[in-house]
Regions:
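A short SAM/SAH-binding and catalytic strip from SAM-dependent methyltransferases
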Residues: 117-131, 154
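Conserved class I S-adenosyl-L-methionine
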Residues: 1-47, 60-64, 83-86, 93
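A generic alpha-to-beta junction signature in SAM-dependent methyltransferases
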Residues: 43-45, 68-69, 142
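Class I SAM-dependent methyltransferase SAM/SAH-binding core
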Residues: 50-109, 133
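Conserved hydrophobic residues forming the short capping helix/wall of the S-adenosyl-L-methionine
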Residues: 69, 91, 169, 198, ...
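Conserved catalytic/acceptor-binding region of the Class I
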Residues: 132, 139, 143, 147-219, ...
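Conserved Class I S-adenosyl-L-methionine
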Residues: 2, 12, 20, 24, ...
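A short acidic, Gly/Pro-enriched loop at the edge of an enzyme's catalytic core
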Residues: 107-118
Length: 280
C-alpha cells in the first residue's frame, strides 16, 4: 500500500471496525443503500466512463458503477484490507471483470493524472484528515470536465439513528450531539462548508442538496439494537462497561427502537447531502 496520512482511520478500518463491516456488508448496504439512487443519479455515469469510487468499503458502490460503465471500468480505493477482500470476492462472484480495487489513502494516493471521468463516494469523504488536500488529489485524477459526486452525512438533528442512540445516556457516557462541521462523521454536514472545501480544492459548479432516505437497521427492535451496539459510536460507548451495564443499555436501546419497527423491519430516517462538482 502507498503512504497513508490518515493513520487513525487506517488503524480503525484495519481492525475491529473493518472486520465488522466486512462481515456484515449486506446489513450495512441495507442501512446506507437508500442513498444509492440519488448518488448515482447525480453521478450520471456513462457506459464508457472510467469511475473512481472513494472509500469503497466492501465494494457495493464500485459494483454499481461497474455495471453502469459496462464498456468502461470502476476502481474502488479504501484503507481497509478486510473490506477490500470482501469487495474483490463479491465482484468476482458477480463476474464483474471491469471492477478493480486498490488499498490506499485517497488523500495522498498517486492516481494517474486525468485517468477518470467520474469520482463517486458513499459516506466516506467525511473522514479525510485534510479534506482540501484530499479533494485536490482526487481532482487531479479527474480529466478536465470530470465529475465528482458523493453523499455525506447531513444535518445531525435529522438523523434519527443518532437521536435514538441518545437513549444510551441513561447508562453510558454519551457525548453531546455533534454539530455540523465538527470533526468526524458530520464534518461536511454543512452545505456552506462543503462548498468552501471544494472551492479551495479547485472545483467548479459546486452543488449540495439535502436528501433523506430510510435506513434499515434490523428485522426487529432487538436485532437492530444488537447491530447498532456492535459497531461505530455505540460500540465505543460500551467499551469498559460491565456486563450488567451493557445489558441494561441494550434493553434501553431496544425499547427506544420499538416505535420504529414495522413489517419491513426497523427503519430510521437518515439525512445526507448529495454533493456535485466539476474538475475544470
Amino acid at each position: 500500500m502507498h503512504p497513508v496520512v490518515n493513520t487513525e482511520q487506517a488503524q480503525a478500518w484495519n481492525g475491529y471496525e473493518g472486520d465488522h463491516w466486512a462481515d456484515h456488508h449486506d446489513r450495512w448496504n441495507a442501512v446506507n443503500g437508500g442513498f444509492d439512487e440519488p448518488l448515482f443519479t447525480a453521478a450520471a455515469i456513462g457506459p464508457r466512463d472510467h469511475v473512481l469510487d472513494i472509500g469503497c468499503g466492501a465494494g457495493r458502490t464500485t459494483r454499481l458503477a461497474a455495471r453502469q460503465a459496462a464498456d468502461g471500468r470502476a476502481l474502488g480505493i479504501d484503507l481497509s484490507a478486510p473490506m477490500l477482500a470482501r469487495a474483490r470476492a463479491e465482484a468476482a462472484g458477480e463476474g464483474l471483470a471491469n471492477a478493480a480495487f486498490v488499498q490506499g489513502d485517497a488523500q495522498v494516493h498517486p492516481f494517474a493524472p486525468a485517468a477518470f471521468d467520474v469520482a463517486v463516494s458513499r459516506f466516506a469523504t467525511m473522514f479525510f484528515g485534510d479534506p482540501v488536500a484530499a479533494f485536490a488529489n482526487i481532482r487531479g485524477a479527474l480529466r478536465p470536465g470530470g465529475r465528482l459526486a458523493f453523499v455525506c452525512m447531513g444535518d445531525p438533528g435529522r438523523n434519527d439513528w443518532l437521536r435514538v442512540l441518545t437513549a444510551l445516556g441513561e447508562h453510558l457516557p454519551v457525548p453531546p450531539p455533534p454539530s455540523p462541521g465538527d470533526p468526524g462523521m458530520f464534518s461536511l454536514a454543512e452545505p456552506d462548508r462543503v462548498r468552501e472545501v471544494l472551492a479551495d480544492a479547485g472545483y467548479a459548479d459546486i452543488g449540495a442538496t439535502a436528501v433523506e432516505a430510510p435506513m434499515h437497521w434490523g428485522r426487529d427492535a432487538a436485532d437492530a439494537a444488537r447491530f447498532l451496539l456492535g459497531s461505530g459510536p455505540a460500540h465505543h460507548l460500551l467499551a469498559g462497561a460491565d456486563r450488567a451495564t451493557a445489558r441494561r443499555a441494550e434493553d434501553t436501546l431496544t425499547a427506544a427502537l420499538r416505535p420504529h419497527a414495522g413489517p419491513a423491519g426497523v427503519r430510521l430516517r437518515g439525512a445526507a447531502l448529495v454533493v456535485t462538482a466539476v474538475a475544470p
